[in-house]
Every structure is written in structure tokens, then in C-alpha cells.
């Protein structure tokens, strides 16, 4: 799970409120998710955002070019430029995570993250999503992640609660018990 700094949350909140005032929340959310996916898949972009070797001006112009070519909304393009100008380009992923949380809350949706050792099928995801919806009494959006180190089983995070029913966790508990015996 992504850790968000207070600064990233403040930028995300400002963008969220501005997009809400302009009636542009869905567009900004779509642009932000697309840009976050780009960051996650491009090592060069991550290096540009994170490295102090690139000047703020270089970051601003590169982000402006990306926003233009990707067809992002002008508001989102300005937001990226502002973060880079203020030396916060490395906080963009954290801001996306915070914005996503604000957007989900505004829509009355709870977010859950499920980790498994191998990719889940669509039916498995749907079943978990519907079970969680019944538990929380509302809509749930499920994000799945693959983590082979779990060996098997499942980890489920809903808000601040974590249920760890992975084989790795069970082995860890057994190891702890055996060391203590």
C-alpha cells in the first residue's frame, strides 16, 4: 500500500476541492489513475520524478508534454506542473492515492485491497467484493495485487483493518511458537 505524506494529502485535497467546484471530479480521477499507471510502468518516468538530478524546469516541461500527449484535462496538467514547480514531483503517486480515497469517500464507496500468491479469477474477485459489500453494508471497490511471497491464502485490507490468512503468516506463527517452546 502506498504511504502518503501530509503534503501529498494537502495537494490531493486542493485538487479534489477544485475539481469538485468545477464539476470535473470524474475526469480528474480518470486522468490521475491513468498517470499513476504510467508512473508504475515507466522506470524512466519514476526516475524523472524522484531524482534530484533533474531540475524543476525539466520536470515541469516533461510533465506538461506528457499531459498534452495523453490528452489530460488542463486542470490536471496544471496540477502536475504545480507539484513539479514546488519540488513535489516525487509526491504525485501519494497524491493520487489520497485523491482516490477522497473520491471514493465522496461516492460512498469503501476500498479494499486483496493480496494473493497468484492472480485471482474474475469470479473470485466478484465473490470477495460481494461478501465485503454485505459485511460493510455498502459498495466496495476491490483492488487485487499478486504477492508470490504469500505462498498461498489471502491478505485482505479494508480501511485500517488487515486480515492475514496467508500461508506465509501461518508459517511465521508456527515458527514463533516453536522458538518459544
From Swiss-Prot:
F(1)F(0) ATP synthase produces ATP from ADP in the presence of a proton or sodium gradient. F-type ATPases consist of two structural domains, F(1) containing the extramembraneous catalytic core and F(0) containing the membrane proton channel, linked together by a central stalk and a peripheral stalk. During catalysis, ATP synthesis in the catalytic domain of F(1) is coupled via a rotary mechanism of the central stalk subunits to proton translocation. This protein is part of the stalk that links CF(0) to CF(1). It either transmits conformational changes from CF(0) to CF(1) or is implicated in proton conduction. Belongs to the ATPase delta chain family. Its main location: membrane. The keyword Methyltransferase does not apply. This is ATP synthase subunit delta. GO terms for cellular component: plasma membrane; proton-transporting ATP synthase complex. The lineage of its organism: Bacteria, Pseudomonadati, Pseudomonadota, Alphaproteobacteria, Hyphomonadales. F-type ATPases have 2 components, F(1) - the catalytic core - and F(0) - the membrane proton channel. F(1) has five subunits: alpha(3), beta(3), gamma(1), delta(1), epsilon(1). F(0) has three main subunits: a(1), b(2) and c(10-14). The alpha and beta chains form an alternating ring which encloses part of the gamma chain. F(1) is attached to F(0) by a central stalk formed by the gamma and epsilon chains, while a peripheral stalk is formed by the delta and b chains. One of its GO terms (molecular function) is proton-transporting ATP synthase activity, rotational mechanism. Disulfide bonds: none annotated. Transmembrane segments: none annotated. It comes from Hyphomonas neptunium (strain ATCC 15444).
Amino acid at each position: 500500500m502506498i504511504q502518503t505524506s501530509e503534503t501529498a494529502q494537502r495537494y490531493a485535497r486542493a485538487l479534489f476541492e477544485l475539481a469538485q467546484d468545477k464539476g470535473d471530479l470524474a475526469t480528474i480521477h480518470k486522468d490521475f489513475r491513468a498517470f499513476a499507471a504510467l508512473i508504475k510502468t515507466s522506470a524512466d518516468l519514476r526516475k524523472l520524478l524522484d531524482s534530484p538530478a533533474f531540475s524543476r524546469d525539466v520536470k515541469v516541461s516533461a510533465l506538461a508534454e506528457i499531459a498534452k500527449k495523453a490528452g489530460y484535462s488542463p486542470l490536471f496538467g496544471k496540477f502536475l506542473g504545480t507539484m513539479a514547480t514546488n519540488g513535489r514531483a516525487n509526491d504525485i503517486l501519494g497524491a493520487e492515492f489520497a485523491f482516490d480515497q477522497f473520491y471514493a469517500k465522496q461516492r460512498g464507496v469503501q476500498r479494499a485491497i486483496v493480496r494473493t500468491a497468484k492472480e485471482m479469477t474474475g469470479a473470485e474477485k466478484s465473490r470477495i467484493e460481494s461478501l465485503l459489500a454485505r459485511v460493510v453494508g455498502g459498495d466496495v471497490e476491490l483492488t487485487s495485487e499478486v504477492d508470490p511471497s504469500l505462498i498461498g491464502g489471502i491478505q485482505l485490507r479494508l480501511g485500517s483493518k488487515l486480515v492475514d490468512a496467508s500461508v506465509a503468516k501461518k508459517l511465521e506463527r508456527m515458527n514463533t511458537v516453536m522458538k518459544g517452546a
